[in-house]
Amino acid sequence: MNVNIKYPLVLHDNWLLESITGQINKNVKYTNSLIKKDFISPSSISKTPILRILRFLKTTKSSDLTAILSDSTHTVIAIFPFDPAIINFEIRYKHRITYHTPNSLILIKQANLRFVNNVELTTEWGITIEDEIDVAVLEVLDLEIFQRDQIMLGVNIENNLQLIYYDKSYLNLCGKSRQRDSLGEKEIKEVISQSYDDVVSI
């Protein structure tokens, strides 16, 4: 594991950005939302896929749960499908997935990588990303609690976490050329820091 002085998160590595951008082909026009099936599986990536649950966002109409996850340097939008992720988690641990899990570390055992259109992202997920950015999200199918301790990040550390969608390497793949006229990264961080009435995170 790399020691990162600027982002001193214990038991945490930075793998999100490189792993996600490595799966997106700039020259391919995706006709399906799925970018990579089994993007995370026992043998799919070289680094252990540990992420921190920064916060839960909204519950969708199909009872899936959306969230913001992070490694030591970047954040990404994720969704936990009710079936199988939430059902299996709550059977395994005998409590709701939102109970004492924000700010804890999870091990992603299986996940797909897929695009979500901006309309769905806004109406169903409660997040607005600039229209000219194609948004790839983690569809987490199976997870385990890696470290249950809810360790709050300092404000300075969390502020240094960057949404992958605004990283230059991601924009080179998924950004569009037209002028930006929507929310920037600062405004996005304000949106995702809000509390949502339909999700209880203890």
Curated annotation (Swiss-Prot):
Keywords: Chromosome, Nucleus, Telomere. One of its GO terms (biological process) is telomere maintenance via telomerase. One of its GO terms (cellular component) is telomerase holoenzyme complex. The keyword Plastid does not apply. GO terms for molecular function: telomeric DNA binding. The keyword Nucleus applies. Component of the telomerase complex involved in telomere replication. Stimulates RNA/DNA heteroduplex unwinding which favors the telomere replication by the telomerase. Belongs to the EST3 family. Component of the telomerase complex. This is Telomere replication protein EST3. It comes from Debaryomyces hansenii (strain ATCC 36239 / CBS 767 / BCRC 21394 / JCM 1990 / NBRC 0083 / IGC 2968).
